[in-house]
Each structure stands twice: as structure tokens, then as C-alpha cells.
Amino acid sequence: MIVVDTSVWVRTLRAGASKEADTLRALLDADEASLAVPVRIELLTGASRLDRPRLRRSLSALPILYPSDDTWRLIDGWVDVAGGAGQRFGFGDLLIGALARETGSLVWSLDADFERMSGLGFVDLYEP
């Protein structure tokens, strides 16, 4: 499974004709894409009032990853490891990464923070 980050969705939604859009369509067609709940919320909050219902229906077809108590414990441990390495990450990225780790999924993002997270062994990246 591939957890698709907000950065990929935004690029795809803004520029329908792109290599990211083609790759995302292929992942969706193969049922290989999943949606971390923070990504879903970011996408819905960024959509216009008119586009939001259609986007919500489209996103509802995807498996959505929700945090558990274990997710929060994993993030708490990562904060210590990252801090010890002189790294800091946003809450949303940590949550997306932890949800991917727990499900054995790869993360596809255009955000360099996930590359840094990968360097610490927190996530494995999908590279199309």
C-alpha cells in the first residue's frame, strides 16, 4: 500500500496532466493507494465549498488510516529520536508517517521532510 501525501494530491488536483497524476491514477486503479486521515482533512479544508462534496465522495472510496493508542506512542518515541538527531517535524507529517509505518505502507510525498524522516528510519518512501 502507498500512503499518498497531501503534496501529491494537490499537485495532481491542480495540474491533471502530470507524471504524478498518471502515477496516482494507476495506484488508484490498482487499489494500492490509501489515505491518512490528516491528508483527508487537509484536502477537504483546502477545497472550495462547491468542490468539497464531490471531493469528499471521491476520497471516501479509499481506505482511510486512523490513529490508535500505538500510533501516539510511536510518534512520542520518534520525537525523542528526531530531537536527538537535531531534526524536527510537523505534527501532521509525524502522524502520516506513523500511520504508514504501522500499516507497513510506503509514503509518497513531494515534501522533503519525509526524505529526512526516511533517513532516520521512520518511513519507507515510494519513488515512482
Positions of predicted regions on the chain:
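Short, well-structured N-terminal submotif of metal-dependent ribonuclease cores
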Residues: M1-L35, L44-R57
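Acidic, PIN/NYN-like endoribonuclease modules and their adjacent C-terminal/linker elements
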Residues: M1, G97, R101-P128
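General small-molecule cofactor/ligand-binding pocket signal
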Residues: S34, L65, V123-Y126
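Active-site neighborhoods of divalent-metal-dependent phosphate/nucleic-acid chemistry enzymes
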Residues: P63-L110
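A conserved hydrophobic position in a structured secondary element of the catalytic/binding core
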Residues: V4, L35-A36, P67, S109
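Short, hinge-like loop/turn segments at secondary-structure boundaries
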Residues: L50-R54, A82-G83, D124-P128
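Conserved glycosyltransferase catalytic-site signature
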Residues: T6, V37, F91-L94
